[in-house]
Every structure is written in C-alpha cells, then in structure tokens.
C-alpha cells in the first residue's frame, strides 16, 4: 500500500512538472481541446455532490493514475467554480487533497480555503484554521477572508474588532473590507451605518469602488432617502462615467420600483442594459426580475429572447428566473410554454422548475394541471418532492379536500425523505380542518403519522388540545402524554388542560 501511495505521489509531482509542456504535438488543436478537458474534469468533480457521485480523493487520484493533467492553478479554479455553484464541501476537499500532496499554498490560497471552511464547517472552524496559520502566511488576503466570514455571519462585535486589528496591521488599503462591513450592516437592517463607513474610507484616502457606491445607494434607498440617492449619483458623476456599473443601475431601479417611481426605474433599466456585459447571465436575470417588478411583460420577454440568443443552451438558473417572473406576472400560458420548453431540453431534472409550475397552476385554481406536473416529475427524477407536496396539500386544505391532502401527507412519510421538514403553516392548516370538523379521531391519526417522523412538538400538542376542546371531548391522558415527551406546559396549555383533562 505504501509503495502504491509513493508511486501516486511521484506521478502527481511529475504531472505538475510538465505544466509548461502541455500544448505540444498532437495537442496542436490545443485551446479547444484543453478547454474541453477542463470542462470534462470539472463536470466529473461537480457530479460528486450528487448521490452516488463518488469521492473527491478517489477521483483526483484516478485522474493522476490515468495521466490526466492535474495542476494546482486548475484545481484552485475548480474549487472556486464549485464554491460559486454552492458546493463548498467538495471545493474544500480539493484543498485537503492538495495539502495531502504537500502542495504549497500562498496567502491567497489560504484565504479561499478559510472561506470554504466557514461555508462548510462553520465560523468556529474557520477561526481555528486562521489561528493555526503561521504569522508569515497571514496577510491582507487571509485577514480579509476572516473578516468576510464574520460579516456574512453578521457577527458585528467580532467583525469590528477584527477590522480594527486589520487597520493596526496596515491590512486595510482598499475598499473591500469596508464593503464587507457595509454588507453586514445592510443584512442586520442597519443601513444608517453605511454612510459613516464611506466617510471613514475617505479619511484613509481610499477611493470608493462601484460596489461601495452601489451599497451606499442601497442604504439610502432603504432609508427612503431619495435626496441621498441623488447626492451619491452626483458624486459618482464627478468621479467619471467609469465608476458606474450595471449593478449600480440595478440598485437604482430596485429603489425606484420600491417607491413606485416606475418611469425612473425604466430609465435605470435602460442604463443597466447599456452598461452590462452581455456575456454575464446575471445581468439578464436582473433585468427580467426588475421588469417583472414593474409588471412590464413585453420587456421581460424581450430580455428573455436576448438571453436565449446569447446563450442558445439555456441553463436551469435562467429557466428558473424566467418561470418565476412569469408566475409573478400571472402569465399561466407563458409558464406552461416555458416549462414545456425546459422539460424538452433539460439535462438534469430540477424540481425547482416543477415547483414554480405547480405553484403557478394552483394560483389559477388549476389543480389537475398542477398534479399532472407533480406526477410527471416523480417519473423523471428522485426528488426532493417535499415542496411540491406541501403546495398541493395547502391548496387541497384551503378547498376543503382534506382527505386528498392526507393521502399526500402519508405518501410523503412513506417516501422516507429524511431531508423533509413540513412547515408550521401546513400543520396548522391540517389542525384547522380537524378543529372545524370537530374530528378528534382524524387529528389523532394525523398525529400518529407525524410521530413516524419525529416526536410531536409543544405547538402540535396545543393544536391537538384545541381540537378536543372544539369537539367537546375529554382527553384524560393528555397530561401524562405531555410529561412523557418532556414538554413544559405553558399558560395556554394549562388553560386547555383544565378543560379537556379535568
């Protein structure tokens, strides 16, 4: 075993050593071939996040044994892409594999890894990793990465202390740390603290970047300070047109939409389109969402057509954006058409698309069509179906079809989808039906189904007792049931118990 590991390590090192000799001989067809290989490798690595996809270490080792070029800068890129598409654990496994191969990390590499640790293992693990780094490795990138972690988790006290430490160490030389703090305060619902950070930036002779200006504008919008918005725009104009980005105009449009200034919103959206990079999908998504916000269906379709011309192979993210937009516009014919188009072209069946279609049909009281989408989805993918089932159940309960809703609930339990958690709204809706029908037996049967999943909560027992009270029936053993579950009886439950459990 030790010999095979040594051979693997030597082969990996040899692969790295040939980095500069990649494009030669039969690779003269080169760039397209190389790009195709990269796509193939990334596709394999990203599939590891799916059920039965395999393990990262085994896959990377196999690449090395097969002579597939596995270079550090490519691995870093794959890790960044996995992070972008919300697979931080898989991305972290790439770094862990590189560490086992004794590949040296720069400060920037450590910064990325720290971020991935926070995303996949939590903030405490990220702090431990940061503290384990040698002082010679800790630089502006690593300090900045930890600050970002604090800000994302809205740990204001830690973020402020860490930021002051960065200032003392001369690790604050650009707008990024300030932008992180601004984003944190916006997330904390404290937009009034953003302007002071802009002042602090300027006192340090740091020029605001386009992101800074965008968040400053956002903060003014949150405070409904339209004069403040105009002042920021005037300052940006003084800086020069180059400081304006599509994101600036997206924020402007969102602010104007929120206060009902649709004319100004339209102007901002036109500026967004003129300033955006046509190769960035998110720009089209923002346009679609914002035009939806002003109920401009014709512009939504126009941007959708632009996106499809730019990207003939439309991905799931774009289809999801369009379907959600059409659903908000109550364009059921559009939803039907786009959903059918997606189903006919998709590589992987994404239940989010089906959920939007189901929700759209139910809004129009078209239960049969919604159920047809659900049944079709069950044949085409392995789930998860919890969201779809809840949508159907809520609709059935609102339309006095509790028997059908219960069948869906029982089916969900039989599916044994361990990731499913029902909403409190759904449980309350079921019990509202039992209470109005004075159906104690039905409520108890429902509780039995619930306990197949997990013990009943205190809130569920309250709803059950209300059903007994509505039915005018006693439940002599209710106190004992609560005690056995270790539930601390609150004032409302004491009152209910006094009436149903004398």
From Swiss-Prot:
Domain of life from the UniProt record: Eukaryota
Protein name, UniProt field: Pentatricopeptide repeat-containing protein At4g01990, mitochondrial
Entry annotated with the keyword Mitochondrion: yes
Species: Arabidopsis thaliana (Mouse-ear cress)
Pfam families per record: PPR
Sequence similarity: Belongs to the PPR family. P subfamily.
Gene Ontology cellular component annotations, sorted alphabetically: mitochondrion
Keyword annotations of the record: Mitochondrion, Repeat, Transit peptide
InterPro entries attached to this UniProt entry: Pentatricopeptide_rpt, TPR-like_helical_dom_sf
PPR repeat spans: 139-173, 174-208, 209-243, 245-275, 280-310, 315-345, 350-381
Transit peptide endpoints, chain numbering: 1-13
């Amino acid at each position: 075993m030790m010999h095979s590991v040594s051979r693997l390590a030597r082969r990996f090192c040899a692969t790295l050593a040939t980095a500069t000799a990649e494009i030669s001989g039969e690779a003269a067809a080169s760039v397209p071939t190389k790009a195709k290989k990269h796509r193939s490798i990334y596709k394999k690595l990203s599939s590891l996040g799916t059920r039965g996809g395999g393990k990262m270490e085994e896959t990377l080792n196999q690449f090395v044994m097969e002579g597939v070029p596995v270079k550090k800068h490519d691995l870093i890129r794959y890790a960044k892409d996995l992070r972008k598409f919300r697979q931080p654990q898989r991305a972290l496994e790439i770094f862990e594999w590189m560490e086992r191969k004794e590949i040296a990390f720069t400060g920037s590499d450590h910064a990325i890894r720290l971020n991935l640790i926070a995303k996949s293992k939590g903030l405490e693990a990220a702090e431990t990793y940061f503290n384990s780094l040698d002082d010679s490795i800790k630089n502006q990138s690593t300090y900045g990465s930890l600050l970002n972690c604090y800000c994302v988790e809205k740990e204001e006290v830690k973020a402020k202390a860490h930021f002051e430490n960065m200032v003392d160490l001369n690790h604050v030389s650009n707008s990024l740390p300030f932008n992180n703090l601004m984003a944190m305060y916006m997330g904390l619902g404290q937009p009034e603290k953003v302007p002071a950070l802009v002042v602090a930036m300027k006192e340090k002779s740091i020029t605001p970047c386009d992101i800074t200006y965008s968040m400053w504008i956002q903060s003014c919008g949150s405070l409904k300070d339209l004069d403040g918005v105009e002042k920021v725009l005037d300052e940006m104009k003084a800086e020069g047109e180059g400081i304006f980005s599509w994101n600036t105009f997206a924020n402007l449009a969102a602010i104007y939409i929120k206060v009902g200034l649709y004319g100004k919103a339209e102007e901002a959206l036109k500026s967004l389109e003129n300033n955006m990079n046509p190769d960035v999908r998110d720009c089209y998504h923002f346009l679609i969402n914002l035009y939806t916000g002003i109920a401009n269906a014709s512009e939504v379709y126009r941007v959708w057509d632009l996106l499809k011309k730019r990207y003939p192979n439309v991905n799931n993210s774009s289809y999801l954006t369009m379907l959600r937009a059409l659903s908000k516009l109550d364009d059921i014919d559009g939803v039907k058409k786009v959903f059918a188009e997606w189903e006919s072209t998709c590589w992987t069946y994404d239940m989010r698309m089906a959920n939007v279609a189901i929700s759209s049909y139910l809004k129009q009281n078209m239960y049969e069509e919604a159920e047809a989408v659900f049944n079709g989805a069950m044949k085409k993918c392995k789930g998860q179906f919890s969201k779809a089932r809840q949508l159907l159940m809520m609709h059935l309960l609102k339309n006095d079809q509790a028997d059908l809703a219960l069948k869906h609930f029982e089916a969900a339990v039989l599916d044994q989808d361990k990731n499913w958690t029902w909403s409190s709204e759904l449980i309350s809706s079921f019990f509202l039906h039992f209470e109005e029908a004075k159906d104690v037996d039905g409520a108890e049967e429902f509780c039995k189904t619930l306990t197949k999943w997990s013990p009943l909560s205190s809130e569920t027992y309250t709803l059950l007792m209300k059903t007994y009270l509505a039915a005018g029936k006693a439940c002599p053993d209710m106190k004992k049931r609560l005690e056995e579950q270790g539930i601390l009886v609150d004032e409302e439950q004491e009152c209910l118990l006094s009436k149903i459990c004398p």
